[in-house]
Design a protein with these regions (language model features):
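N-terminal Sec signal peptide and the immediately downstream disordered periplasmic leader
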Residues: 1-71, 183-184, 218, 270, ...
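Acidic, small-polar-rich N-terminal luminal/periplasmic segments of exported/outer-membrane proteins
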Residues: 10, 23-159, 174, 509, ...
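Transmembrane beta-strands of outer-membrane beta-barrel pores
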Residues: 167-173, 186-188, 197-201, 228-230, ...
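Transmembrane beta-barrel wall of Gram-negative outer-membrane proteins
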Residues: 169-199, 209-247, 262-279, 283, ...
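Face-selective signature of the C-terminal outer-membrane beta-barrel domain
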Residues: 232-240, 265-432, 441, 449-459, ...
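Outer-membrane beta-barrel signature, preferentially recognizing the C-terminal barrel domain
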Residues: 252, 256-279, 384, 388-390, ...
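Gram-negative outer-membrane beta-barrel transporters
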Residues: 402-409, 417-418, 517-521, 525-529, ...
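C-terminal beta-signal and adjacent terminal beta-strands/loops
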Residues: 474, 525-531, 535, 632-640, ...
Length: 704
């Protein structure tokens, strides 16, 4: 593992690697996301950071998203769902972050303007996680404006059987998590089998345990590979299932009933892979992969409230809404890629991708209005069914040209052709014995776009790598944003088939330094984005079916309104010249939103957030003890971009972690984390659920 990678991964883990490991050359850390083939992290053309396997084993976090929270530029968001944490990158919402598993996209056509699919994978299957900041990988998809998270799974082992057993208890949720992974190789075959189960209770805060913050998830996965000469074949199967619900604060007792539940969110995938080393004069490698993926979701919502009405005939009106939605997304995709070594030190990767998402949604609902006097007593029941699909064809190419000593120029391009259509939309409502049928007209939307990225790197100084980069981002509206009518929390949001794609231009200057006991990775970035999709209040327009927002009913629709500018500075630094190793990681960000009626820099982003700490490794005859004391903190955040002002105070927590390795081959490990030692009451800027108070997490790991 590289020293640079260990610097970064150590910052996001509960402990770092041993001192002997931190001396390994950084050129041994291989990443694939920026070049679509194995290359060392040091020469990556973009800002990429790695969470390695040791970091994952040391972690006592209940959510894999929490393992990424200390990467500069990354923030956690929860949408009030404790079991479905997501990540933001450089101020961009999770819907603008591309999620990959072994380079294959996890699409989610139900995504809205501030939420995506989430991280539907368990760490037991993972070898590492690669995080690219900004849309700098045209090879995997510039469709992300914020960045890319690529989960790389284990592919086998160097002996017949080896594996990891892990168990963690977390007092913050009084919850347990258990996992096992076994991998190995037999002749030309290699394999991996993994599984996990997590049952987390309600979150414990300084004010007590929070209701409706419990959740469960489980996962299973299999990898089967075969190697024959220059040919490598692979088959992957994995499944992840989650059940969670929404936490909601109602201190004034405004609601008699309020719940948003996801009893089932399940991802199932089958993937095939083929690689061959051609070793021709120019053509060197060919890669092929394809997959089928299904995401199923059940969504249940109930809202009941009573409001006084200044009329003797009504006096008070009780409105009760219930919805139950089942949706299914079926994805098929295929990629073909070639790698060429051309004259004059050119390395060229070209390829083509095809992807199709098909979504079906079945919903049922009930809305009743009853007055205290009985003068109003109305109940409406509805049923609806939607079918829609989106197809994407893309061609991509990226060339690395070493045109002079120490100079490398990378240029990439990707061409998209997208087509979306609503193939069916039926609805029926029942009110007082009257039946009303509706049928939506078939609608379609299409687009084509070329996006580029380029990077210039210089490595002529000792232990220093400099880079300058530019990239374009592109996010096409989801099927939900284009065509579907969705209900949640008592509100209705309408799709808009006239939406345009979101676009961004991104600039970056970066430096990596590894010398004189220092490990530093830093970047200055700037981006301009336009045509952001947001939900607006309905005013009786056609897209809202003539509905208007009111105090008793909430109606919204999607439209392109926002422009955004973002400036930032990221840094990760560690010094290993003393017995105790100080380190720091952080992000400085300023973001501006602009609409036709508003221009503000109060966008809900904390100007500064990060982590600072001291690490120490004690090597003894029978055990190695790695300790880490650190402060995690963020400045205050103010948001007035939605017409109402919200403020989140700044916060800081003191934390301590220790990892103990023992056994003849250091095969046993005990991880202890003491979090929020001062029992601080706080909430992060993009999480709506209050953070846990003082808590302890203890884990046991057995490598065999």
């Amino acid at each position: 593992l590289s020293t640079l990678s260990l610097c970064i991964s150590g910052i996001v883990s509960t402990a770092t690697a041993t001192s002997s490991e931190t001396k390994i050359s950084n050129e041994e850390t291989l990443v694939v996301t920026t070049n679509r083939s194995a290359s060392n992290l040091w020469e990556s053309p973009a800002t990429i950071q790695v969470i390695d396997q040791q970091t994952l084993q040391n972690s006592t976090n209940a959510s894999i998203a929490d393992n990424l929270q200390d990467i500069p530029g990354v923030e956690i968001t929860d949408n009030s769902l404790a079991g479905r944490k997501q990540i933001r990158i450089r101020g961009e919402a999770s819907s603008r972050v591309l999620i990959l598993i072994d380079g294959q996209e996890v699409t989610y056509q139900r995504a809205g303007d501030n939420y995506g699919v989430g991280l539907l994978i368990d760490e037991s299957a993972l070898e590492r996680v690669e995080v690219v900041k900004g849309p700098y990988s045209v090879l995997y998809g510039s469709q992300a404006i914020g960045g890319i998270v690529n989960f790389i799974t284990k592919k086998g082992g160097d002996k017949l059987a080896s594996g990891v057993v892990k168990a963690v208890y977390n007092s913050a949720t009084a919850g347990w998590e258990e996992s096992i992974a076994v991998q190995g190789s037999i002749g030309g075959f290699d394999y991996r089998i993994n599984g996990s189960y997590s049952d987390q209770g309600n979150r414990d805060t300084p004010d007590g345990r929070l209701p409706n913050t419990n959740y469960r998830n489980n996962s299973q996965g299999v990898w089967l590979g075969y190697n024959s000469g220059n040919h490598r074949f692979g088959l992957s199967l994995d499944r992840y299932r989650l059940a969670t619900q929404t936490y909601y604060e109602d201190p004034d007792g405004s609601y008699e009933a309020f719940s948003v539940k996801i009893p089932k969110l399940e991802r199932e995938k089958v993937g095939v892979f083929y690689d061959t080393d051609v070793d021709g004069d120019y053509l060197k490698k060919i890669h092929f992969d394809a997959y089928e993926q299904t995401i199923q979701r059940q969504f249940a919502n109930e809202v009941k409230t009573t409001q006084p009405v200044p009329s003797p005939m009504i006096q008070a009106l009780t409105v009760h809404n219930k919805t139950d939605t089942h949706d299914k997304q079926y994805t098929q995709a295929v990629t073909l890629q070639s790698h060429f070594s051309l004259p004059a030190n050119n390395e060229l990767v070209t390829g083509a991708q095809y992807k199709q998402d098909r979504v079906s949604q079945r919903s049922g609902g009930m809305t009743s209005s009853k007055s205290l006097t009985g003068f109003i007593n109305k109940e409406t029941r509805t049923r609806s069914y939607y079918e829609s699909e989106q197809s994407t064809v893309s061609l991509f190419a990226q060339n690395d040209w070493q045109f002079a000593d120490h100079w490398t120029w990378t240029m990439g391009v990707r061409q998209y052709w997208l087509s979306s259509k609503l193939t069916r939309g039926d609805g029926v409502s029942y009110t007082a014995g009257i039946i009303s049928d509706t049928s939506l007209a078939r609608e379609s939307a299409s687009d084509h776009e070329m996006v580029t990225s380029t990077s210039l790197r210089y490595s002529g100084f000792d232990n220093l790598e400099l880079r300058a980069a530019f990239a374009q981002g592109y996010v096409f509206p989801t099927l939900s944003q284009l065509f579907m009518q969705t209900s949640a929390g008592g509100s209705v949001t309408y799709g808009n088939p006239d939406l345009k794609a979101e676009h961004s231009n991104n600039f970056e200057l970066g430096a990596r330094y590894n010398g004189n006991q220092w490990l530093i990775d830093s970047a200055v970035y700037y981006s301009e984005a336009k045509d952001y999709i947001a939900s607006l209040i309905c005013d009786g327009s056609i897209v809202c079916n003539g509905n208007t927002n009111s105090s008793r009913s909430s109606y919204y629709y999607y439209d392109n309104i926002d422009r955004a500018k973002t400036w930032g500075l990221e840094i990760s630094a560690e010094y290993n010249g003393w017995v105790f190793s100080p380190y720091i990681s952080g992000n400085l960000i300023r973001r501006q939103y602009e609409t036709s009626t508003l221009k503000t820099t109060n966008t809900g982003e904390p100007a500064i957030n990060g982590r600072i700490g001291l690490k120490h490794t004690l090597v003894m005859g029978q055990a190695n003890i790695i300790s880490d004391v650190f402060i995690r903190a963020a400045s205050s955040a103010k948001d007035d971009s939605n017409g109402t002002e919200t403020n989140v105070p700044g916060w800081a927590t003191l934390n301590f972690a220790v990892n103990t390795e023992f056994g003849n081959e250091d095969q046993y490990r005990i991880n202890l984390a003491l979090n929020n030692l001062t029992d601080k009451r706080y909430r992060t800027a993009h999480e709506t659920i209050p953070a846990a108070g003082f808590n302890a997490a203890i884990g046991f790991v057995w490598n065999f």
